[in-house]
Protein backbone atom coordinates (compact mmCIF):
# COMPACT_ATOMS: atom_id res chain seq x y z
CA UNK A 1 0.00 0.00 0.00
CA UNK A 2 1.17 3.51 -0.78
CA UNK A 3 -0.03 6.58 1.08
CA UNK A 4 0.43 9.99 -0.47
CA UNK A 5 -0.14 12.88 1.95
CA UNK A 6 -0.56 16.16 0.04
CA UNK A 7 0.61 19.33 1.78
CA UNK A 8 2.26 17.36 4.60
CA UNK A 9 5.45 19.27 4.13
CA UNK A 10 6.79 22.35 2.45
CA UNK A 11 10.29 23.69 2.21
CA UNK A 12 9.13 27.21 2.99
CA UNK A 13 10.03 28.87 6.29
CA UNK A 14 6.34 29.53 7.00
CA UNK A 15 5.53 25.82 6.79
CA UNK A 16 8.47 24.80 8.95
CA UNK A 17 7.36 27.35 11.55
CA UNK A 18 3.82 25.92 11.67
CA UNK A 19 4.99 22.29 11.76
CA UNK A 20 7.19 22.90 14.81
CA UNK A 21 4.17 23.20 17.11
CA UNK A 22 1.51 21.35 15.12
CA UNK A 23 0.17 18.21 16.81
CA UNK A 24 -1.19 15.62 14.37
CA UNK A 25 -1.63 12.48 16.50
CA UNK A 26 -3.80 10.53 14.04
CA UNK A 27 -1.43 11.15 11.15
CA UNK A 28 1.52 10.26 13.38
CA UNK A 29 -0.11 6.90 14.26
CA UNK A 30 -0.73 6.05 10.60
CA UNK A 31 2.77 7.07 9.55
CA UNK A 32 4.27 4.92 12.32
CA UNK A 33 2.78 1.87 10.58
CA UNK A 34 4.41 2.70 7.25
CA UNK A 35 7.93 2.91 5.90
CA UNK A 36 8.88 5.98 3.88
CA UNK A 37 9.60 5.19 0.24
CA UNK A 38 10.53 8.44 -1.42
CA UNK A 39 10.60 11.96 -0.12
CA UNK A 40 10.06 14.88 -2.46
CA UNK A 41 10.37 18.22 -0.74
CA UNK A 42 10.71 20.13 -3.97
CA UNK A 43 11.19 23.84 -4.12
CA UNK A 44 8.44 26.28 -3.09
CA UNK A 45 9.03 27.99 -6.43
CA UNK A 46 8.42 24.86 -8.54
CA UNK A 47 5.23 25.03 -10.60
CA UNK A 48 4.09 21.59 -9.43
CA UNK A 49 3.65 20.60 -5.76
CA UNK A 50 5.24 17.34 -4.56
CA UNK A 51 2.02 15.29 -4.47
CA UNK A 52 1.29 16.15 -8.11
CA UNK A 53 4.87 15.26 -9.09
CA UNK A 54 4.48 11.90 -7.32
CA UNK A 55 1.24 11.14 -9.17
CA UNK A 56 2.75 12.18 -12.51
CA UNK A 57 5.68 9.81 -11.89
CA UNK A 58 3.34 6.96 -10.83
CA UNK A 59 1.34 7.43 -14.04
CA UNK A 60 4.57 7.60 -16.12
CA UNK A 61 3.65 10.97 -17.56
CA UNK A 62 6.12 12.81 -19.75
CA UNK A 63 6.52 16.56 -19.49
CA UNK A 64 8.17 17.96 -16.41
CA UNK A 65 7.49 20.69 -13.90
CA UNK A 66 4.50 22.74 -15.02
CA UNK A 67 4.05 20.69 -18.19
CA UNK A 68 2.12 17.58 -17.15
CA UNK A 69 -1.34 16.95 -18.68
CA UNK A 70 -3.44 17.71 -15.60
CA UNK A 71 -5.92 19.79 -17.57
CA UNK A 72 -6.48 17.06 -20.16
CA UNK A 73 -7.06 14.53 -17.39
CA UNK A 74 -9.54 16.81 -15.62
CA UNK A 75 -11.31 17.58 -18.90
CA UNK A 76 -11.64 13.87 -19.66
CA UNK A 77 -13.10 13.37 -16.16
CA UNK A 78 -15.59 16.12 -17.02
CA UNK A 79 -16.59 14.00 -20.07
CA UNK A 80 -14.92 16.28 -22.62
CA UNK A 81 -13.45 14.49 -25.63
CA UNK A 82 -9.83 15.59 -25.31
CA UNK A 83 -8.30 13.72 -28.25
CA UNK A 84 -4.57 14.31 -28.56
CA UNK A 85 -4.58 18.10 -28.26
CA UNK A 86 -2.88 20.04 -25.48
CA UNK A 87 -5.35 21.40 -22.91
CA UNK A 88 -5.21 24.14 -20.30
CA UNK A 89 -7.46 24.73 -17.32
CA UNK A 90 -9.08 28.16 -17.09
CA UNK A 91 -10.30 28.76 -13.54
CA UNK A 92 -12.66 31.60 -12.63
CA UNK A 93 -11.06 33.31 -9.65
CA UNK A 94 -10.85 36.66 -7.89
CA UNK A 95 -7.55 38.50 -8.01
CA UNK A 96 -7.04 40.78 -5.04
CA UNK A 97 -5.07 43.88 -5.94
CA UNK A 98 -2.50 45.14 -3.45
CA UNK A 99 -0.12 48.06 -3.64
CA UNK A 100 2.72 46.00 -5.08
CA UNK A 101 1.21 42.58 -5.80
CA UNK A 102 -1.80 40.73 -7.18
CA UNK A 103 -3.01 37.85 -5.01
CA UNK A 104 -5.21 35.02 -6.26
CA UNK A 105 -7.88 34.03 -3.76
CA UNK A 106 -9.27 30.50 -3.55
CA UNK A 107 -11.63 29.97 -6.52
CA UNK A 108 -13.98 28.02 -4.22
CA UNK A 109 -14.72 31.27 -2.37
CA UNK A 110 -16.56 32.56 -5.45
CA UNK A 111 -19.25 29.90 -4.92
CA UNK A 112 -20.32 30.21 -8.54
CA UNK A 113 -23.33 28.17 -9.57
CA UNK A 114 -23.15 26.17 -12.78
CA UNK A 115 -25.66 28.59 -14.33
CA UNK A 116 -23.61 31.67 -13.40
CA UNK A 117 -20.34 30.11 -14.47
CA UNK A 118 -21.78 28.87 -17.75
CA UNK A 119 -23.03 32.38 -18.58
CA UNK A 120 -19.60 33.85 -17.77
CA UNK A 121 -17.91 31.18 -19.87
CA UNK A 122 -20.16 31.93 -22.85
CA UNK A 123 -19.30 35.63 -22.49
CA UNK A 124 -15.60 34.90 -23.06
CA UNK A 125 -15.71 31.79 -25.25
CA UNK A 126 -15.46 33.83 -28.44
CA UNK A 127 -12.22 35.47 -27.28
CA UNK A 128 -10.54 32.07 -27.21
CA UNK A 129 -12.19 30.66 -30.32
CA UNK A 130 -11.21 33.73 -32.36
CA UNK A 131 -7.57 32.80 -31.65
CA UNK A 132 -7.95 29.17 -32.70
CA UNK A 133 -8.60 27.62 -29.30
CA UNK A 134 -11.24 25.00 -28.67
CA UNK A 135 -13.12 26.10 -25.55
CA UNK A 136 -15.16 23.77 -23.34
CA UNK A 137 -17.17 24.18 -20.14
CA UNK A 138 -16.42 21.55 -17.52
CA UNK A 139 -18.04 22.80 -14.33
CA UNK A 140 -18.59 25.97 -12.33
CA UNK A 141 -14.89 26.04 -11.42
CA UNK A 142 -13.36 24.39 -14.48
CA UNK A 143 -13.25 25.79 -18.00
CA UNK A 144 -10.89 24.39 -20.59
CA UNK A 145 -9.10 25.56 -23.70
CA UNK A 146 -7.17 23.46 -26.20
CA UNK A 147 -4.66 24.32 -28.88
CA UNK A 148 -1.66 22.35 -30.07
CA UNK A 149 0.98 24.90 -29.04
CA UNK A 150 -0.24 24.89 -25.42
CA UNK A 151 1.90 21.77 -25.02
CA UNK A 152 5.02 23.86 -24.49
CA UNK A 153 3.42 26.32 -22.09
CA UNK A 154 4.61 25.97 -18.50
CA UNK A 155 1.77 26.59 -16.05
CA UNK A 156 1.52 26.50 -12.27
CA UNK A 157 -0.76 24.24 -10.27
CA UNK A 158 -3.64 26.08 -8.60
CA UNK A 159 -2.32 24.69 -5.32
CA UNK A 160 0.82 26.75 -5.86
CA UNK A 161 -0.93 29.99 -6.76
CA UNK A 162 -3.88 30.21 -4.34
CA UNK A 163 -3.14 32.74 -1.61
CA UNK A 164 0.04 33.94 -3.28
CA UNK A 165 1.08 36.67 -5.67
CA UNK A 166 0.40 35.66 -9.26
CA UNK A 167 3.32 37.41 -10.96
CA UNK A 168 5.93 34.73 -10.28
CA UNK A 169 3.64 32.04 -11.68
CA UNK A 170 2.88 33.74 -14.99
CA UNK A 171 5.92 32.52 -16.88
CA UNK A 172 6.41 31.99 -20.61
CA UNK A 173 5.70 35.55 -21.66
CA UNK A 174 8.65 35.29 -24.04
CA UNK A 175 6.98 32.55 -26.10
CA UNK A 176 4.30 33.40 -28.65
CA UNK A 177 1.71 31.22 -26.91
CA UNK A 178 2.66 32.71 -23.54
CA UNK A 179 2.14 36.25 -24.82
CA UNK A 180 -1.17 35.24 -26.41
CA UNK A 181 -2.44 33.65 -23.20
CA UNK A 182 -1.47 36.72 -21.17
CA UNK A 183 -3.28 38.99 -23.65
CA UNK A 184 -6.38 36.81 -23.54
CA UNK A 185 -6.20 36.78 -19.76
CA UNK A 186 -6.38 40.58 -19.75
CA UNK A 187 -9.24 40.60 -22.25
CA UNK A 188 -11.18 38.03 -20.21
CA UNK A 189 -10.72 40.16 -17.09
CA UNK A 190 -12.14 43.20 -18.89
CA UNK A 191 -15.19 41.30 -20.15
CA UNK A 192 -15.94 39.67 -16.80
CA UNK A 193 -15.35 42.83 -14.77
CA UNK A 194 -18.39 44.52 -16.29
CA UNK A 195 -20.51 41.40 -16.80
CA UNK A 196 -23.98 41.71 -15.19
CA UNK A 197 -23.45 38.53 -13.14
CA UNK A 198 -20.25 39.94 -11.69
CA UNK A 199 -21.92 43.27 -10.93
CA UNK A 200 -24.84 41.51 -9.20
CA UNK A 201 -22.45 39.54 -7.00
CA UNK A 202 -20.51 42.62 -5.80
Where does each model-flagged region fall?
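N-terminal basic/disordered segments at the start of proteins
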Residues: 1-18
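An N-terminal, globular interaction/scaffold subdomain
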Residues: 16-118, 123
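Glycine-rich, often proline-containing surface loops adjacent to acidic residues and nearby aromatics
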Residues: 96-108, 142-144, 162-169
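Short, glycine/charge-rich beta-strand/loop segments that flank catalytic centers
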Residues: 134-147
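Loop-centered beta-sheet repeat module
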Residues: 150-201
